[in-house]
């Protein structure tokens, strides 16, 4: 287009290109639900929730940890763990090559990050799935890191919060992956016997072996609005039963209505609500927010959550 303009009006194409190059890339983002064009700095300030339609966009595991935990006194748990291709698995691509490409793309060694820290002064361990790493699938490293996070809770009397975003068990690790379902469930049973709270926060999406194990084993099962949660996907179910599924089937609002969830919390409510719940469950002092007036002001500025949001 610029070459065509250059021929008709000399200098026009070059000027247009120069002007375009001054606009930073990635400054705007389109909402995948309502198609609103959003200014990225404002979107990030709103915790990656669309101010127009309240759509909760998918975020990285570290971004999740950053907006949930307090800024000080954080420590990553088992960052040294790396996956291994024990089965020498190959489908259309070698598993080893998939691991390398996903590690480069995400900056993570595997699909789970774990930190101990505080939420408004309440001591916790928080783990979050990285969906962009092989669909957040659960393999040996994910299971081991989850168990190590549980062990920190047992050693230091902390609550555990898990933010799930996963397609399920990692097929490239076969039975090793399926074993993680039992391994993580057994670790959570020890937490339960010790009376330490485990809060599962399901984000979009949660499926397969993760939804069938650690994601649904919380003392409180929480979800973000409109998250897709289930075992098999809705299209697979429709093809199997050959029936049209109800509107909103497998969305968090549908699950809450039918008793599969305890509550739905919008992203800007998670820190305050969960820290208050944990402090009551563990009989700890009330959470300490730095400036109560600023907190209330922030909440007033943020858009109202949709219906069915606690």
From Swiss-Prot:
PROSITE patterns: COA_CT_NTER. Binds 1 zinc ion per subunit. It comes from the Bacteria. Zn(2+) binds at residues 31, 34, 50, 53. It is found in: Cytoplasm. Its main location: cytoplasm. One of its GO terms (cellular component) is acetate CoA-transferase complex. It is an enzyme of class 2 (transferase). Its EC number is 2.1.3.15. Gene3D superfamilies: 2-enoyl-CoA Hydratase, Chain A, domain 1. Keywords: ATP-binding, Cytoplasm, Fatty acid biosynthesis, Fatty acid metabolism, Lipid biosynthesis, Lipid metabolism, Metal-binding, Nucleotide-binding, Transferase, Zinc, Zinc-finger. Residues 287-310 have a biased composition (Acidic residues). Residues 27-296 form the CoA carboxyltransferase N-terminal domain. GO terms for molecular function: acetyl-CoA carboxylase activity; ATP binding; carboxyl- or carbamoyltransferase activity; zinc ion binding. GO terms for biological process: fatty acid biosynthetic process; malonyl-CoA biosynthetic process. A zinc finger (C4-type) spans 31-53. Its cofactor is Zn(2+). Component of the acetyl coenzyme A carboxylase (ACC) complex. Biotin carboxylase (BC) catalyzes the carboxylation of biotin on its carrier protein (BCCP) and then the CO(2) group is transferred by the transcarboxylase to acetyl-CoA to form malonyl-CoA. HAMAP family: AcetylCoA_CT_beta. Acetyl-CoA carboxylase is a heterohexamer composed of biotin carboxyl carrier protein (AccB), biotin carboxylase (AccC) and two subunits each of ACCase subunit alpha (AccA) and ACCase subunit beta (AccD). This is Acetyl-coenzyme A carboxylase carboxyl transferase subunit beta. The lineage of its organism: Bacteria, Pseudomonadati, Pseudomonadota, Gammaproteobacteria, Oceanospirillales.
């Amino acid at each position: 287009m610029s070459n065509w303009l250059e021929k008709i009006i000399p200098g026009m194409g070059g000027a247009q290109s120069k002007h375009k190059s001054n606009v930073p890339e990635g400054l705007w983002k389109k909402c995948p639900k309502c198609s609103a064009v959003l200014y990225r700095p404002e979107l990030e300030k709103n915790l990656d929730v669309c101010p127009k339609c309240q759509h909760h966009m998918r975020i990285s595991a570290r971004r999740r940890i950053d907006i949930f935990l307090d800024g000080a006194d954080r420590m990553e748990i088992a960052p040294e763990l790396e996956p291994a291709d024990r089965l020498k698995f190959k489908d259309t691509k070698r598993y080893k090559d998939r691991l390398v490409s996903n590690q480069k793309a995400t900056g993570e060694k595997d699909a789970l990050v774990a930190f101990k820290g505080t939420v408004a002064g309440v001591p916790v361990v928080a783990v979050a799935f990285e969906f962009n790493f092989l669909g957040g699938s659960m393999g040996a490293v994910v299971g081991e890191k989850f168990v190590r996070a549980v062990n920190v809770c047992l050693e230091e009397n902390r609550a555990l919060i898990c933010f799930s975003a996963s397609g399920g068990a990692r097929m490239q690790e076969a039975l090793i992956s399926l074993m993680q379902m039992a391994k993580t469930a057994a670790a959570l049973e020890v937490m339960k016997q010790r009376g330490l709270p485990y809060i599962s926060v399901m984000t979009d999406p949660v499926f397969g072996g993760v939804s069938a194990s650690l994601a649904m084993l919380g003392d409180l099962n929480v979800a973000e609005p409109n998250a897709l949660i289930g075992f098999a996907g809705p299209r697979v179910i429709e093809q199997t039963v050959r029936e049209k599924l109800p509107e909103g089937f497998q969305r968090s609002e549908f699950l809450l209505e039918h008793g599969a969830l305890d509550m739905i919390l919008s992203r800007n409510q998670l820190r305050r609500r969960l820290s208050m719940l944990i402090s009551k469950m563990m009989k700890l002092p009330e959470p300490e927010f730095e400036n109560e007036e600023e907190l209330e002001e922030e909440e007033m500025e943020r858009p109202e959550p949709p219906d069915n949001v606690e």
